[in-house]
Structures are given as structure tokens and as C-alpha cells.
């Protein structure tokens, strides 16, 4: 990895570090008022206080972990389901069941993410599980589409056709002809879904959904403190900047990593043992 690519990993890693280990860093209580509302930064409160007089630094340190956990769980579940359905649909795309599955997935993709979030949150008020479920339902259609097309392209290659003509089992063709080229695409797709899940979780916090107050949440912090922008903008700017840095940083990281990973996958598509079988 070049110095430029290494440097591009710093912002998302720093934000992830703040989100993951922030709650364990010694700081003031993130939920208890410690001073007056919207007090400016000082030696006692490095980022000042928010609308209720709570320490902004403490809430920033405590407010990212829920977003990361929700996004990670949603991405893992959605990616695994998308990988399974996409692989199956790509390898059996001519079958009626595969076509019906893809049509059903397309119908799910037509539902707005915010509508799904609102409906699920209404059924489970104050629950982070509703945010995770909405993220999963939103991510599955896109993952299935992308991975299905990738699998279909791999199945149509000459070496995959030769393996099928030779009588190789579906499991063998999946292992040797599909998975080596599918894994990089699946990882890149999972990264994109992670960013989308973070954004949806932040949106849920902004709308007051999911775990309720006084729990800290970067998205909720932006909404709660918007009225005090002219008095102390830090309670809004800091969490907003962290969300942007995380989304842009992960996107740039995926962009830098995609070239080398996909290149290696393309060169390593057919291993030495497979070349002998094809010949």
C-alpha cells in the first residue's frame, strides 16, 4: 500500500476508534448536566456544553458506538443474505424460482428507506433493533442485484463453461470458478452497505428514533443542538464532521483498495490445479 493510500485510511480509522473506545475514555457524564446550556469551550469543558448543559466532548465520545454497532450488525446480516441469494440467483438465473426471487427483491427495493424505518420504529419504539432491521431490508436488494450480476458473469466465462461441460458439481464450480472472483466484489459491496447503514442509523437518531434520550447519538446531537448554532456551534459541527469523515473516509478507502484487490482476484481466478483440469 502506497503512502497516499495509507494516509487515506487514517480518517475512518480515527473516527472508528473514537466511536468504539470513546465510551471507555474518562470524561464527564454524557447524560448529566454539568453547566448552563450552550456554554463555549473552556478548560473544564473542551467542546462546551449542549442544549441541556451536558458536556459535548463526553457525548461525542459516547455517541458513536451505537451507530457503529448497528451498522456493523446490519451490514453483516444483509451482506450474508445478499451473498446467499445473489449467488443462488446468479447460478440458477434461468430457473423460475430465481426469477421470482429477483422480482421480489426488486419490489422491496422500491420501498423508501425512511418509510421502512418509520414503520419498523413505530412497531418497536425506542429499540435499536428497528434501525438494524430497516438497514438490513434496505441493503439486501442492492446486494442481491450486484452479486447476482457478478456471479452470472463468472458463470458465463469459458473456464466455468468448460467445468460445467466436464460434469463438475455445482459446489465445485462455486468453489473454484465463482468464489475467487466474487469475494472482492462482495467485500466492496459490504463496505458500501456499511456506509449506507451508518447514514441510516444517523438519520434515525436525527429523527429521534431508536434508543431514546438521554442516550448520546451523533445524529441526535445534530438535531438537538441546531437551535444553538449561533451560540455554540460545536455540539452540531463535531458530530456532523465525524459522520462525514466516516462516510467519505470509508468510501475513499474502498476506492483505493478495490483496484489492487480486484486485480489480484482477476489474476488468481484460476489456480494451477484448476488450469490442469481445464486443459
Task: Describe each model-derived feature in a short phrase.
Residues 138, 184, 191-192, 233-279:
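C-terminal transmembrane helix and the adjacent membrane-cytosol boundary/short C-terminal tail
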Residues 46, 50, 94-149, 153, ...:
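Generic hydrophobic transmembrane alpha-helix motif, especially the helices
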Residues 118, 127, 132, 136, ...:
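Non-cytoplasmic
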Residues 54-69, 89, 93-102, 155-156, ...:
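Amphipathic cytosolic juxtamembrane alpha-helices at the membrane-cytosol interface
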Residues 22-25, 70-106, 118:
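Transmembrane-helix boundary motif in ABC transporter permease subunits
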Residues 13, 65-81, 171-204:
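Transmembrane alpha-helices
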Residues 1-31, 104, 108, 188:
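N-terminal signal-anchor/first transmembrane alpha helix
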Residues 109, 122-123, 200-242:
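Glycine-rich helix-loop "coupling/hinge" segments at transmembrane-helix boundaries
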Amino acid at each position: 500500500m502506497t503512502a497516499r493510500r495509507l494516509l487515506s485510511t487514517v480518517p475512518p480509522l480515527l473516527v472508528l476508534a473514537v466511536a468504539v473506545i470513546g465510551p471507555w475514555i474518562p470524561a464527564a457524564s454524557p447524560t448529566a448536566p454539568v453547566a448552563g446550556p450552550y456554554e463555549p469551550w473552556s478548560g473544564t469543558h473542551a467542546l462546551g456544553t449542549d442544549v441541556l448543559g451536558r458536556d459535548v466532548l463526553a457525548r461525542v465520545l459516547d455517541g458513536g458506538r451505537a451507530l457503529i454497532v448497528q451498522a456493523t450488525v446490519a451490514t453483516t446480516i444483509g451482506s450474508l443474505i445478499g451473498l446467499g441469494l445473489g449467488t443462488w440467483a446468479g447460478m440458477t438465473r434461468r430457473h423460475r424460482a430465481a426469477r421470482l426471487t429477483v422480482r421480489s427483491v426488486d419490489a422491496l427495493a422500491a420501498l423508501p428507506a425512511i418509510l421502512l424505518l418509520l414503520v419498523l420504529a413505530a412497531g418497536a419504539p425506542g429499540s435499536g433493533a428497528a434501525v438494524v432491521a430497516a438497514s438490513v431490508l434496505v441493503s439486501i436488494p442492492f446486494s442481491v442485484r450486484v452479486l447476482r450480476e457478478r456471479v452470472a458473469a463468472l458463470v458465463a466465462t469459458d473456464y466455468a463453461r468448460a467445468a460445467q461441460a466436464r460434469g463438475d458439481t455445482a459446489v465445485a464450480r462455486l468453489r473454484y470458478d465463482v468464489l475467487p472472483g466474487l469475494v472482492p466484489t462482495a467485500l466492496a459491496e459490504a463496505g458500501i452497505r456499511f456506509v449506507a447503514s451508518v447514514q441510516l442509523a444517523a438519520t434515525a437518531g436525527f429523527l429521534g428514533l431508536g434508543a431514546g434520550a438521554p442516550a448520546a447519538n451523533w445524529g441526535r446531537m445534530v438535531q438537538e443542538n441546531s437551535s444553538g448554532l449561533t451560540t455554540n456551534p460545536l455540539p452540531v459541527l463535531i458530530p456532523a464532521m465525524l459522520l462525514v469523515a466516516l462516510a467519505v473516509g470509508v468510501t475513499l478507502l474502498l476506492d483505493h483498495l478495490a483496484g489492487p484487490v480486484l486485480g489480484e482476484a482477476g489474476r488468481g481466478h484460476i489456480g494451477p490445479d484448476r488450469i490442469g483440469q481445464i486443459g
